[in-house]
């Protein structure tokens, strides 16, 4: 073997040896990384975004305690468990391996109405979609009252206690029609029809409003326009009832002025 062949062979051998060492190093690091991941456990469960849902309650729903193997945590399953709390609208979960933490982020429902029982006592809140939330320990919300619903919390019997669709339509339409501050009460009738009670407007006290069925958003916009154009003024005869059951029409009942 010539001197050049010997040098070439030596360089080739060095490259092979170097490649082998590199592969061995990568494999060793991989094994160390796998071993590290296998030993990482959850040190803390952090909850963010919760205002009314107690964080400890959400942690119990998550069913991931300190010492749980991080590789055994399924974030989507954890989020699904947490989202079962009545106040939680959306939930996400994220594992943070380096910190040994599980972070749960929640978005809570926004109250749109307050259901009261037959004695007028607060029972539970409702959001715009008709989901019920238990009364929080913190301060209440300035939202319309809902009468005529079951006083028992719907989340205790989800298969039998459901918010009527007519009420859900009204709750969704109130802010869209710009009348959320105009409606003081929503009363469910036996046939699931809706009667509203306004806040005092101009010289008028609170007025009952028969809403009827049909296009709820359009009816509420009609009520808003009527309140601005008529109720805010002083009519010849005070209005004591408003009927919106007929599309495109506002029917009122008046009472004669005394004297």
From Swiss-Prot:
This is Cell division protein FtsQ. One of its GO terms (biological process) is cell septum assembly. Keywords: Cell cycle, Cell division, Cell inner membrane, Cell membrane, Membrane, Transmembrane, Transmembrane helix. The keyword Transmembrane helix applies. Pfam families: FtsQ_DivIB_C (PF03799), POTRA_1 (PF08478). The lineage of its organism: Bacteria, Pseudomonadati, Rhodothermota, Rhodothermia, Rhodothermales. PANTHER family: CELL DIVISION PROTEIN FTSQ. It comes from Salinibacter ruber (strain DSM 13855 / M31). Its main location: membrane. It is found in: Cell inner membrane. The chain crosses the membrane at residues 16-36.
């Amino acid at each position: 073997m010539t001197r050049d062949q010997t040098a070439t062979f030596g360089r080739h051998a060095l490259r092979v040896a170097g490649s082998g060492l590199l592969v061995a190093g990568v494999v060793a690091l991989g094994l160390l990384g796998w071993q590290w991941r296998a030993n990482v456990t959850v040190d803390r469960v952090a909850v963010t975004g919760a205002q009314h849902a107690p964080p400890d309650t959400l942690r119990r729903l998550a069913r991931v305690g300190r010492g749980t193997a991080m590789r055994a945590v399924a974030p989507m399953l954890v989020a699904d468990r947490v989202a079962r709390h009545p106040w939680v609208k959306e939930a996400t979960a994220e594992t943070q391996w380096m910190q040994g933490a599980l972070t749960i982020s929640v978005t809570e429902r926004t109250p749109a109405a307050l259901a009261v029982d037959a004695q007028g006592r607060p029972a539970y809140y409702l959001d715009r979609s008709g989901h019920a939330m238990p009364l929080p320990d913190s301060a209440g919300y300035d939202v319309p009252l809902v009468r005529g619903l079951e006083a028992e919390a719907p989340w205790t019997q989800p298969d039998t206690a459901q918010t009527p669709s007519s009420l859900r339509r009204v709750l969704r339409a109130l802010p869209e029609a710009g009348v959320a501050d105009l409606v003081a009460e929503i009363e469910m009738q036996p046939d699931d029809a809706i009667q509203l009670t306004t806040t005092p407007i101009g010289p008028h006290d609170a007025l009952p409003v028969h809403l009827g069925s049909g296009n709820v958003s359009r009816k509420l916009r009609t009520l808003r326009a009527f309140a601005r154009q008529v109720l805010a003024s002083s009519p010849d005869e005070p209005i004591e009832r408003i009927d919106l059951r007929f599309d495109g029409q506002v029917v009122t009942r008046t009472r004669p002025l005394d004297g």
